[in-house]
Amino acid sequence: MDEYEAQLVAVEQALENTTDEQQREELSTLRTNLQELLALTRETEADQTAQQGDILDDELLRLKSELNELEEAAANVGATKNKDEEQQLKDLRAKYNALVGEKCSAPHEHSWGASSYHNALICGVDDEVIINRNSELDVRLRVLYINPTHCEMLPCNYYLEGECRFDEIRCRYSHGALVPGASIKSYIPPDFPRLARNCPVLAKMPDRLWHRGRVLCANFVEQTCRVRLDGQDHKERERDFQFEELFPLITEKEDELTSEDSSSSPHDESSDEIDSDMDDLEAAHRSRMVELSLFTFKPTEKLGAWEQYTRGIGSKLMEKMGYIHGTGLGSEGRGIVTPVSAQILPQGRSLDACMELREAANGDQDYFSVERKLKREQRRQNKANEKAYARETQRTDVFSFLNGSVLGGGESRHQGDQAAKKAKTNDLQQHSTKTLNVETVRVADDIRRKQRDIAKVKQSLDRNATDIQLQKRLHMQLQSQKQELATLQAHEHRLSKEQHTRKNKMFEF
């Protein structure tokens, strides 16, 4: 529109400045066309404005009518909803009022945040209306716990008699816990046939609280149980209880089995698939761990090799927890492979002195190792055991003496005795002075012990003088004991002779 008016002004200015007749006619024609175009444009805009005003009026009227309809519908819905909620609350109250005096299983939230279910008695319905977790209307029930395990669960005796001077908040005992009606479950009666050894139970103590414990033995004839109470705050941990004072607990495994048996899951196929996937993941993880063990540094000593002297409970526990032999510690198998060896440093030495000792040993890292020390002591003990075994094999016992003296010939026996004495003398010459001293002490102890045995046999002979058969056996035993004593005394004589000979040689030297 503005463009057309600007063109019209330009044409009129051109007419005023132009003297050529032909151009003036063309400009006049153009001016006439522009004036007609402007007139038509103004008429069109006026019509469009009127039409738009009519459309807006129509839309405004329609919007007002729709708003009125919505307000009427909302009012109807609100009234209907209020009626439904009132009816629902009425039904809920009627339902819960019918449960007053019944037993149930109600939740209890402890002061540390944990929640657990306990058997309780419904004693009333609260007037307050609440919204439960499912955004539904609900009411709260006032319950008293039947098996209270904590002081805040214990019912107040004065409240039950209507004489409590404190309100619900100030009283240290329970005036009834408020729990949502939708959260209560069915009452769990005590299953007394489950009372057996190691069965977890709740036992009623004199303080009216129920304490946890385990059954040691049950007597179904007298209906009594001996229970070992948990914790260290009981002077008498083992007590006898009547069945009425016990409540058998259901463990988590039994609870899971019961829930699985009572209700069949609609997602069995999906759970089977999940289990199979978990099995596949576990198998893949185990194969990866085995593959990792092939590239792991193999120590000279097996991890847990010391358990060959024990029952190996440590390795068994590690296997149950998923440990694979040959891999490192940790869930990924990348931990240490060789165990950390214990070390004992010299007593009263500083760390600098210990480092100097290790450097003097060419930097041996196992210089203070306990295992090396134990192995060294074990080698010493093995050598001592071998020497002791050799000495025992060369000793003449009772049976060898009897066989040589009774079954052997006279001259040959004499020659054998001479050869044996010569061999023993040569054997004594090979021992050190310290070994001879130890052997002398040991032989002296054996002689004293043998003399005590002979004295006991003589006392037995005096006591059993009338029993002929026993007298014969005791005489034979006494003779053998005397022969052994003679052998020991001869051995002691050879030892003392050898020691005396060495002493004389030292004097001569």
From Swiss-Prot:
PANTHER family: ZINC FINGER CCCH-TYPE WITH G PATCH DOMAIN-CONTAINING PROTEIN. Disulfide bonds: none annotated. This is Zinc finger CCCH-type with G patch domain-containing protein. Residues 411-420 have a biased composition (Basic and acidic residues). One of its GO terms (molecular function) is zinc ion binding. The lineage of its organism: Eukaryota, Metazoa, Ecdysozoa, Arthropoda, Hexapoda. It comes from Drosophila pseudoobscura pseudoobscura. It comes from the Eukaryota. Pfam families: G-patch.
